Amino acid sequence: MNAKRIRGLLILAAVIAIAVLIWRHFTQTTPAAPGTSEQHAARTSHSENSGSGGGRRAAMRTLAPVQAALTQSASVPHYLSGLGTVTAANTVTLRSRVNGQLMALHFQEGQQVKVGDLLAEIDPRPFQVELTQAQGQLAKDQAALLNTRQDLARYQQLVKTNLISRQELDTQTAAVRQAEGALKADEGAVASAQLQLDYSKITAPISGRIGLKQVDVGNYITSGDTNGIVVITQTYPIDVVFTVPEAEISTILNAQKSGQPPVVEAWDRANQKKLSQGILLSMDNQIDTTTGTIKLKARFDNLDDALFPNQFVNIRMKVDTLKNAVVAPSAAVQMGNDGRFVWILNNKNEVSKRQVTTSIQYGQLVVVTAGLDADVQVVTDGIDRLTEGAKVEIVPSALTEKTPAIAGEKS
């Protein structure tokens, strides 16, 4: 009995709970009072009115943001680039031209020397002895020649009186000639001995920088020593050998025909610092078939020792100046299926694609040879979001006003 009563009470409680939930649901969805509805409508209207300007601003914010720059007309220098190695204008391995003991070295390693400076001495005594002997033989043969000439003069008088035969006169004449020949040989021997003595003093054959010595004082050296005494490199001036593609040969030849040798700049390994400026000296007479390049040589004064033999440098050679060329930022030029193109802007900030033809690049600029005129606004950033005819928003940038002017080359 108690169990049935409890069960009935639970069912009654559940029914009451369900009824309460249904009542609360219908009371919340009942339409609001007229005053409340009007207030809600007013708030809604105010919200819409106040948000209309924000909606327009939101619409503007959906425009693709881009940066732009104006193309311009300028005189653009045309440079060819290449990799080069610094080489001494002249390199000499200083060797002795006579054999003997090295008695002295008159230089410091690394110093600059001038042509004719005394650099080393070989023991001169053996050569002085040879010179003395040659001079003695010369004196002896000079006396013999004088005697034979005097005899010839007597024979010439005697033959007139038939006191001697004609054959004896001819014999004496031949003796004089033999003595004259011996005298010439003696003179040559003296000159040779003097030359050997002079060679015992070794002088600088060129002006340049002394390297590290290859032999010490006291050693016996010969003219056939492979390493020699020291190496001298001429660094004032100095040369750079570099290569350019064979396709540029005609451009270089035309530049040489202008009357002035092309200007060549040497830059450091990182291509960040200009080291020196010189001129093109010569071009090789054949192309390297393995690389498709040709060698050129440039010469630099190098008075500041900015270049050193075997140094690696980057080369920039000016071969021409393009007058009144249309230039645009390199960032504006894109590559598509139909070739290179740019996005141009009209006065309504609408973009359109324009096919262009380009040539040389100079810094952050590229020369446009077809498809663009000067003072045309082109997109430089935000290009990946553009479509034909789309309206864009130009955001400030250092390139917005104009492309960077070419220093000293602006037309």
Swiss-Prot record:
Places the protein is found: Cell inner membrane
Xref: HAMAP family: MdtA
Organism: Pectobacterium atrosepticum (strain SCRI 1043 / ATCC BAA-672)
Its membrane topology: Peripheral membrane protein
Family assignment from sequence similarity: Belongs to the membrane fusion protein (MFP) (TC 8.A.1) family.
Pfam families, sorted: HlyD_D23
Protein name: Multidrug resistance protein MdtA
Gene coding for it: mdtA
PANTHER family to which the protein is assigned, alphabetical: MULTIDRUG RESISTANCE PROTEIN MDTA
Disulfide bond sites: none
Annotated region (Disordered), positions in chain: 31-58
